[in-house]
Every structure is written in structure tokens, then in C-alpha cells.
């Protein structure tokens, strides 16, 4: 069974290792000369390049009762080698042993340089990067001239060198995360942590060299197989990045605010439904109140979204398209961010993908049982974010437009599904009833709070960010494609499904952007419906227009650039990049652990001078107060409030910590801008609310002895009654 499972990614049969099969005799001529092993059926299927019609007839055998299996280790190793060769790799005993020998000397060089740099006071990031660069240069020279000599003539080729450089950079950036995980999270000494980091890097380098740098070019592979192999490699790397870095990178203010949700558990909240709070509460209960505990829910939601997207794409098209769909989703910003950051978008995207899957099963495949799954997914989705309600409107439009799906309007299933989804949504309804419909009122009026703004151009920019330019062009091409006379009924219904479930939500966002500024991430989930079609177009370009062919060519650099960008950003956030400064546009909203430590020192100084416990007031709606609360909750018990203490709005802080009349406890205002210490967001002076306000001071926040930002603060003796304001 294990043999058949590992063969499934590159072929479309369930049991590629079966010894019972029948085929036309002339197909035996298609077998390659280098075919080895005993699984002839696998060789035939791969030689067919996806052009064979294969029918499987299940046969159940009893487990062996007598004797022993003829499979020896040599048989299994031969099978694995052949499987890798069929996938385009050059993994052999010869190349592996030579690569290992070269790698051994590379490890010695790497470790020596790393230890030398660390002993001379270099930072962890600089030491590991310098050691890797020197060792990788040495390894490339010997690998190209010796380890892979039978597949490569040893001369310098810039194309191969650029590929080697790409693989090496990816390995380097992931290695930094592994090293940081071992040192910062698991407290392994750096001189020991470098060894497992090197082993992980060597694994990436070897398989990257075998499949990408020095692939087997003697036997041509179909584009379909090449994309499958690329999908497997890239998705594994993306998942590795998430798993390594998700607990190392500091939380963004939004995540700390939702962590505050979990500290004040309720049926719902003012600005979002409760799902994000429930997931954070569960994660922190298991892993603790740290980045790991907060973000584990996002990681799981990312896996769920990938799984449902794969199944959805396979139902619409085929297995190869499904693998490419997961690849595209993984490298697009909408997929990477939602699977890494613990915001309401994480469960929303997972629920959106699940709802699409069940809606396709119900409306296109006519599966009665899919309505139950749809109701649960839809209910969970609107418990994550109200945006998922758009799928309900979209489903109604599709049922109206599609004659076959219209039959469901006469059946009880849709109405029972809607009832169950409403029951799941009931906690939000109950909370709103108890709080004068505050959340519904906020969501329905927030668009025009800042006045009229024509922002269609902003929406287009945000869509470009979420999809990348190539992804946006491909989505537009897929969305505007029309039916062909040769299309059968299923193809027409499939196209209608994709266009309706993408087009209607997109149209609604375009309408909203004509009079108000949208958030950059609002359109993210709506592209899930069209990603399978984009993935299908990647291998159908020969039958499409010249534009589609150019899009096909552009996907490879897009995948590389996006993957590199994520790895570089994560390494930069955790370990930094030698010589790269910290831009103010980033640091003014990030690195709150260092800022919180400085605020603790300020509070300690005020406490020692006054003998009273100060009140920390973050002069923003919720971001400063939430970030400081998260990064001080273990070390100190500071009394941290939001700007609502000064009479301004504070979102959920209005419910958790409402403003008080007056106090003689010291007030420490904290802000990233000094103007926010004097005036509120409307421009009104707030200094008369303070008792004997001091001068505005600032502290420079450093990270690895590098200045990253300034924090402004003012200490006052107390607070007057807000009613006088």
C-alpha cells in the first residue's frame, strides 16, 4: 500500500503497483529503455504521458497467511529510484553517495565559519549566512564537476548556476528559521543547533539539485508531470516555512487584538464574529500564550483550505489541475497570509473553500448529502466573518440562472441547510440582541463613517497585491472566457458556476468601492472559486490564445518570486538580513516585544517615583493596548487601557475596560506619533483631561543593537472626569 500511495502524486490510478492488469500489446513499445523494477504497469502509465484511458476494477485480497514476501530491500530501493526517475529526478546511489561526501566537507567548512563568527561576536543571522554562502559555493563546484557528472558535463552554465542559486537561497532562508527555532524557542546552544539546521539544508539542496538544477534530461516529461513535481516541492517548502516560522515571528497588532478576544470570551464581539477568538483560546490553552498558541489555528485552517480546494478543483477538472490549484493558492499572498496569520481571514478562507466544495457537490453533482456539509461550512464561515454571507446570495443567483440547479428550489434540502446554518450563527444573533445590535450596526454603517470616497483604483491595487499581477490577469482572462459550441453541458455549467461564484462577489466589492475605501484583504476569498480554472489554463495554453500562452510562461518566475519573498520576509523579521536596515514603514507597526520591554521600564520608573501603579494608555483604537498587553502579560501585571479612557472610541475596549470618571493614579500615554498625545483623531485637544501633564518624551527602541523605532510617551499625575470633555 505504501508503494501505491507514494506513486499517486505522479499517476492517476489508485494502485500503480498492481500485478494484475491488461493492456494492448503495442503499448509495450512505449516503454523506455531504462525501465527497471517489476512494476510494468507504472512504466506503461507514465510512458503514456496521460493519454491512456485507464479503468480500475477493485479486487480485494486476503492478507498473506503463509510464506514471506518476495519484496526485499533492494526491490523497494529500485522501485523508489525508478519512481524518482519517472518524476524527472536524478536520485541514484552514485549521485547520493557523491553528494553526501561533498556535503560532508561542506558541513566542516560551514560549521567552522559559523563557530568562528559566533566567537567573534557576530549575530546569529550573519554567522549562519556567511557559513552557508562559503560552503554552498564549495559544494556547487564539486557537485557540478563530480557528483552529478553523469548528468552534466561540468562546464559552467549560467542557467544551471542560476537554478542552483535559487535552491540555495531557499535552503538558506529556511535554515535560518530552523536555527532560530532551535536557539530561541527550544534553547539549544547555537554551536549545537547549527548541525540539524545544516542537515535540513542539505536535504533541500540535494532534492533541489536532483529535480531542478541537474534533472534527468535524457527522458522528456510531459508538462503535466513537471507541474505535479513542482507543486509537490513548492507546497512542501511553503508548509515548511509556515511550520518553522509561525511561532518565531512576532504577532502583528491585529493578532494581539484577537488574542484579547480570547481573554474576554463571549458569544460574539463588536467588530467580528467569535470564531477567531475560539481558535486562539483553544490554541493558547494547548500551547500557551505565545506566538505558537495564537497562530496554530491559522496553520490548521491553511491545511483545511488546501484540502478542500484540492477536492473542489479535482471535481471541476482533474487531479493534475487540483495539484496546480493548491500550488497557486500556496504561493499567492491571499493563501500564504491566511494560512500564517491568526486573523478572521484564516477560518474564513477555510470555510469559504469548504462551502465552495459542498456547493459544487450539491449544485453541479446533484449530491443530496452535500447540503449538510454546506450548511455546517456556511455556518462556521459566518461565525468567522460576515463576508461569507456573499456565498448565500451567489448560490441563489446560480440556482436562478441554471435550469438543472433550479430544481433544488422545490426540494427541502436548501431550506433545511439554511436553518442549520442559522442555528450555528445564533451565538452572534444572541450577542447582538444583548448589546443593542451593536455589531450589525457597526458593520452596516462603517463604510460611510469617513465620508464619500471613490476608491475603485484602490480596489484594483489591492486585488493585484492579493493575486499578483500575473494572477489578476489570469483571473480576468478566466472570468471573461465564453462558451464554445463544442462544450458539453457539464463544461457550460462549470463555467457558469465559476463565473457566478467569482463575478457576483467581485461586482459587489466594485460597487462598494465606488463610494468608500475597501480594506486590502476583503476580496481575498472570492478568488478561491476561480483558482482551479486558472490552474487548468496553465496546461491548456496550446488550445487557447497567445495571451494564455504568455501567462503560462509567466507563472514559473511568479512562483519563484513569491516563494522567495515569503522566505526572505520571514527571515528578515526573525533574524534580520546583514546590512539591511529596518524601514520605519514596517517597524512603526511591528516589533512590539522590544517596545513592550521599554514601556515596562518606563512604568517601573514611574511606580518607583510615585509609589502608585500607573495606568498605561495606548493612544490608538486597540493596536497599541493589545500589543503591549500580549507582550507584558507574563513578565508584569500592567494596567493597560486603550484611548477610550480619554473619551475616544476603543472598539471592544469600550466593553472590556470602559472609561472612568477620574483617577489620581499616574497616566502614561503611549503613542507612535507625538501628535496623538495632544489631540484625538478628530483634532480636539485632550490635554485638559490630564492632571498636571508632563512634557512629551521619547525612547529609541533597538533590536540586535540596531535602532528600529521611537516610542513617544507622556506621564501625567492623573485623569480628570471625562464628562467635562
Regions found by a protein language model. Name each.
Residues 296-316, 354, 358:
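Transmembrane-helix motifs of polytopic, lipid-linked glycan transferases
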Amino acid at each position: 500500500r505504501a508503494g501505491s500511495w507514494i506513486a499517486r502524486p505522479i499517476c492517476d490510478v489508485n494502485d500503480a503497483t498492481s500485478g494484475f492488469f491488461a493492456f494492448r500489446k503495442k503499448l509495450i513499445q512505449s516503454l523506455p529503455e531504462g525501465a527497471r523494477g517489476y512494476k510494468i504497469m507504472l512504466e506503461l502509465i507514465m510512458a503514456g504521458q496521460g493519454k491512456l484511458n485507464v479503468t480500475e476494477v477493485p479486487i480485494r485480497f486476503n492478507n498473506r497467511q503463509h510464506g514471506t514476501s518476495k519484496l526485499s530491500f533492494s526491490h523497494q530501493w529500485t522501485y523508489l529510484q525508478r519512481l524518482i526517475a519517472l518524476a524527472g529526478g536524478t536520485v541514484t546511489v552514485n549521485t547520493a553517495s557523491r553528494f553526501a561526501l561533498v556535503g560532508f566537507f561542506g558541513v566542516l567548512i560551514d560549521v567552522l565559519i559559523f563557530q568562528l563568527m559566533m566567537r567573534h561576536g557576530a549575530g546569529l543571522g550573519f554567522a549562519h549566512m556567511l557559513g552557508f554562502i562559503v560552503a554552498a559555493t564549495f559544494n556547487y563546484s564539486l557537485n557540478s564537476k563530480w557528483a552529478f557528472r553523469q548528468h552534466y558535463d561540468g562546464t559552467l552554465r549560467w542557467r544551471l548556476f542560476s537554478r542552483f542559486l535559487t535552491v540555495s537561497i531557499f535552503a538558506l532562508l529556511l535554515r535560518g528559521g530552523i536555527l532560530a527555532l532551535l536557539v530561541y524557542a527550544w534553547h539549544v546552544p547555537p554551536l549545537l543547533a547549527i548541525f540539524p539546521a545544516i542537515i535540513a539544508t542539505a536535504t533541500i539542496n540535494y532534492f533541489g539539485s536532483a529535480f531542478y538544477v541537474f534533472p534527468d534530461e535524457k527522458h522528456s516529461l510531459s508538462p503535466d508531470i513537471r507541474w505535479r513535481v513542482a507543486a509537490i516541492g513548492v507546497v512542501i517548502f511553503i508548509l515548511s516555512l509556515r511550520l518553522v516560522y509561525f511561532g518565531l515571528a512576532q504577532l502583528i497588532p491585529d493578532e494581539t487584538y484577537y488574542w484579547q478576544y480570547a481573554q474576554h470570551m463571549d458569544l460574539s464581539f463588536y467588530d467580528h464574529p467569535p470564531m477567531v477568538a475560539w481558535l486562539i483560546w483553544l490554541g493558547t490553552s494547548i500551547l500557551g500564550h505565545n506566538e505558537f498558541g495564537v497562530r496554530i489555528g491559522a496553520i490548521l485552517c491553511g491545511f483545511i483550505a488546501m484540502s478542500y480546494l484540492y477536492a473542489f478543483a479535482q471535481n471541476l477538472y482533474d487531479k493534475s489541475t487540483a495539484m496546480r490549484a493548491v500550488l497557486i493558492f500556496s504561493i499567492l499572498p491571499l493563501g500564504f497570509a491566511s494560512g500564517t496569520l491568526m486573523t478572521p481571514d484564516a477560518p474564513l478562507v477555510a470555510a469559504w473553500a469548504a462551502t465552495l466544495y459542498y456547493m459544487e457537490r450539491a449544485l453541479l453533482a446533484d449530491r443530496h448529502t452535500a447540503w449538510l456539509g454546506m450548511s455546517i461550512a456556511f455556518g462556521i464561515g459566518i461565525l468567522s466573518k460576515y463576508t461569507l454571507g456573499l456565498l448565500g446570495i451567489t448560490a441563489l443567483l446560480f440556482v436562478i440562472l441554471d435550469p438543472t440547479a433550479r430544481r433544488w428550489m422545490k426540494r427541502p434540502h436548501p431550506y433545511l441547510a439554511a436553518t442549520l446554518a442559522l442555528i450555528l450563527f445564533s451565538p452572534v444573533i444572541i450577542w447582538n440582541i444583548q448589546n443593542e445590535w451593536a455589531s450589525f450596526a457597526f458593520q452596516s454603517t462603517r463604510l460611510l463613517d469617513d465620508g464619500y470616497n471613490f476608491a475603485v483604483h484602490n480596489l484594483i491595487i489591492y486585488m493585484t497585491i492579493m493575486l499578483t499581477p500575473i494572477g489578476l490577469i489570469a483571473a480576468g482572462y478566466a472570468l471573461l472566457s465564453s462558451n464554445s459550441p463544442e462544450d458539453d453541458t457539464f463544461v457550460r455549467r462549470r463555467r457558469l458556476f465559476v463565473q457566478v461564484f467569482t463575478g457576483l462577489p467581485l461586482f459587489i466589492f466594485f460597487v462598494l468601492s465606488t463610494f468608500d475605501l475597501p480594506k486590502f484583504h476583503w476580496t481575498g476569498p472570492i478568488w478561491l472559486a476561480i483558482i482551479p480554472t486558472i490552474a487548468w489554463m496553465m496546461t491548456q495554453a496550446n488550445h487557447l490564445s497567445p495571451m494564455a500562452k504568455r501567462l503560462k510562461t509567466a507563472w514559473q518566475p511568479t512562483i519563484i518570486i513569491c516563494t522567495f519573498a515569503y522566505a526572505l520576509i520571514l527571515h528578515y523579521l526573525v533574524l534580520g538580513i546583514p546590512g539591511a536596515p529596518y524601514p520605519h514603514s514596517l517597524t512603526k507597526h511591528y516589533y512590539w516585544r522590544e517596545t513592550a520591554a521599554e514601556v515596562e521600564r518606563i512604568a517601573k520608573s514611574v511606580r518607583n517615583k510615585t509609589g502608585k501603579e500607573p495606568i498605561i494608555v495606548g493612544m490608538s483604537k486597540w493596536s497599541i493596548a493589545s500589543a503591549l498587553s500580549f507582550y507584558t502579560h507574563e513578565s508584569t501585571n500592567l494596567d493597560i487601557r486603550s484611548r477610550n479612557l480619554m473619551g475616544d472610541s476603543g472598539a471592544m475596549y469600550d466593553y472590556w475596560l470602559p472609561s472612568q470618571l477620574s483617577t489620581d493614579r499616574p497616566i502614561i500615554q503611549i503613542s507612535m506619533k507625538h501628535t496623538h498625545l495632544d489631540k484625538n483623531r478628530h483634532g480636539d485637544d485632550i490635554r485638559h483631561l490630564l492632571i498636571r501633564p508632563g512634557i512629551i518624551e521619547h525612547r529609541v527602541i533597538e533590536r540586535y543593537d540596531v535602532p528600529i523605532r521611537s516610542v513617544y510617551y507622556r506621564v501625567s499625575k492623573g485623569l480628570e472626569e471625562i464628562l467635562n470633555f
